[in-house]
Amino acid sequence: MASSFEPSLSTSGMRPPLTSADAPSMADSLPSINFGFEDLRNRMAQFTARFDAFIEKGRKQILEERNQFKIGLAELQEDQRMKQRDIEILNLKSQTHDQTIQKEAAEAAEMHGTIASVTMERDSRLAKRDRLKQQINETQKAINQKLEAQKAHARHLDAQARLNIPELEFWQDYLCLRIEGAGREDRLKFIFSHLLEKDWEAEAWFELGTSSRDYDVFHTRPKVDRDALNGELDILNEDRDFGAFLKRMRRLLVEKMQQKRPTI
């Protein structure tokens, strides 16, 4: 480093007195000044080099930081894009999950409805089965009662038949009557002869139904008025006097035959 200029060093007190012969010239009497330009130039060059190095280093640092910022920004953008994609995927999954839940809820509701319908149908069938069982039991009971009544009636008819055989034979002889089948188990055909004095071969008959307790007449020859038949049947079903009924039927048939034959 160059030494600075010090005026105190140029004072005369610092030098010995000079003679006139030895006195320096005016130029020689001027102080010797060393500004240190070379050192200053070197120092400026060093400063410039250091400054340029600092600037270059700063520029490189700025470029590196900018590159790092760009890289970080790109990474952040990529991360944001990935997160956005993840969000979209999650939203899609959430929508799918909601749709699945709604579908399962609808299926569950439909299943509950089906179960309720099946339960109602089962209960209805069980109630119907119970009613049918009750009806079957009641029908069976009625059938049993009817069978017992028919058996009792059959026993009664059998006993009555045994008692009435002599009486029936009497009426057959007395009324010129014979009994035949009418083509059905529950019908009998009663045929009368010797009805007309002028035509002993002429016959008349009627079919009697015996399927129930009350008797009924289905056919007659000659044809007898229905009102007259119903009157005779009412008497028979009330008093159960079969012999008297046969006599009345013979009389009705004779009257009908006499009405049809011309008088001479």
UniProtKB/Swiss-Prot annotation:
Record-stated family: Belongs to the SPC25 family.
Pfam family, one: Spindle_Spc25
Species, as recorded: Aspergillus oryzae (strain ATCC 42149 / RIB 40)
Coiled coil: 59-152
Predominant location: nucleus
Annotated protein name in UniProt: Probable kinetochore protein spc25
Annotated region described as Disordered, given as residue ranges: 1-25
Single GO BP term: cell division
Localization of this protein: Nucleus; Chromosome, Centromere, Kinetochore
Gene3D superfamilies in UniProt: Chromosome segregation protein Spc25
One cellular component term from this protein's GO annotations in UniProt: Ndc80 complex
Gene symbol of the encoding locus: spc25
Record keywords: Cell cycle, Cell division, Centromere, Chromosome, Coiled coil, Kinetochore, Mitosis, Nucleus
Record field: compositional bias (Polar residues): 1-13
